[in-house]
């Protein structure tokens, strides 16, 4: 795949044209980056998510397969014509995919990082409205649904992550603090009557249940990933299912 990217040609071309040459300096630069532990997705400048290609670089997290469960849940559960906000959009993969799969929805994507929004803008191509905001601070309007893959890694667990993640992906998008639930708590504080679809960490379900109850939210559904780990929760305000 990397050779295909360097040549700017599909894999079929690469296999059929063995004589095709790539500037050796470009190969050397790419190999040095890979040997330094940089994720292949950053070197290629793109990755696949939900059957679509998204641009990625060190300004945003690399979309994971687990997050496709969040998107599937949103596509299935969100009411027709709803107003939806994706908090902490990063590359924009969640917001863009939901908007394209459910064109009846009005989707807005937010991020506190201007750098991340620049990447999201390349991926959105006008499909969603992008707003720089610390969670929902920039809004006076209400939303029907909030979707988010927030930072959720406990600060003490950062050093246990794979080197590719720990040393290359944006730290602020990985961990919110010691508990790992700090941003989730803030989202619940600001959610109003909106339903929520959130990605959570391994072992975090009970803490999220407690936070939801403290903020008067029901846990309506829990979706597991392929390893059987609770990965996505659906929440609604008491009395607003």
Predicted regions and their residues:
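Short loop/edge segments at beta-strand edges and connector loops
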Residues: 44, 131-133, 200, 224
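Flexible, glycine-/basic-rich loop-and-beta segments that form/coincide
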Residues: 238-241
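Conserved SAM/SAH cofactor-binding pocket of Class I
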Residues: 65-160
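Mobile active-site "lid"/loop adjacent to the S-adenosyl-L-methionine
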Residues: 152-182
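Conserved Class I SAM-dependent methyltransferase catalytic core
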Residues: 178-236
